[in-house]
């Protein structure tokens, strides 16, 4: 599917995306990757925490579609165990609150087509996203606000 209308969107995602009047919020693909984790460690997890807070405050207008690298948790377990607990807590809170979408499916194309803009770490997804012509902003872990 290359158009939003053709996508198979889960009902729980639509619950996050649709406004009360039936129109759609702007959807931001938030992609978090392994290279940034390995470079920035605790600071990277702190950045995610701040990003989630900002998007939660703006959830009436913006739907966040958080898509972490599929190997992020196993990488933390083996290479950065000191950040795993805080990361897992953030992930579980995000999912439990239900104001955003947590996408751990294999279907990266759906996330790219569905979203209106990309925010997050530099990764192979950026190359894919660039082909859409939609806005891309790479997060800077050094800037916390």
Q: Could you tell me what each predicted segment is?
A:
Residues 34, 70, 142:
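Residue-level signal for short, function-critical loop segments
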Residues 30, 64-66, 138:
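Structural beta-sheet core signal
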Residues 43-61:
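Short hydrophobic signal-anchor/transmembrane segments that target glycosyltransferases
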Residues 36-40, 72-76, 128:
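Short catalytic/ligand-binding loop motif for oxyanion handling, primarily in non-cytosolic enzymes
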Residues 1-43:
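A nucleotide-sugar donor-handling region in carbohydrate enzymes
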Residues 103-144:
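A donor-sugar binding/catalytic signature common to diverse glycosyltransferases
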Residues 27, 63, 116-117:
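Structural motif
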Residues 59-104:
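Catalytic donor nucleotide-activated moiety binding site of glycosyltransferases and closely related
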């Amino acid at each position: 599917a290359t158009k939003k209308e053709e996508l198979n969107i889960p009902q729980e995602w639509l619950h996050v995306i649709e406004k009360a009047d039936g129109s759609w919020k702007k959807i931001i693909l938030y992609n978090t990757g392994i290279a940034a984790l390995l470079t920035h460690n605790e600071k990277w997890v702190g950045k995610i925490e701040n990003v989630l807070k900002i998007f939660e405050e703006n959830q009436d207008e913006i739907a966040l579609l958080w898509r972490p690298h599929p190997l992020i948790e196993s990488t933390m377990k083996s290479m950065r165990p000191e950040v795993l607990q805080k990361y897992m807590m953030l992930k579980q809170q995000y999912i439990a609150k239900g104001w955003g979408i947590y996408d751990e499916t294999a279907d990266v194309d759906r996330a790219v087509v569905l979203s209106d803009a990309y925010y997050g770490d530099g990764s192979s997804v950026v190359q894919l996203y660039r082909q859409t012509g939609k806005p891309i902003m790479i997060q800077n872990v050094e800037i916390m606000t």
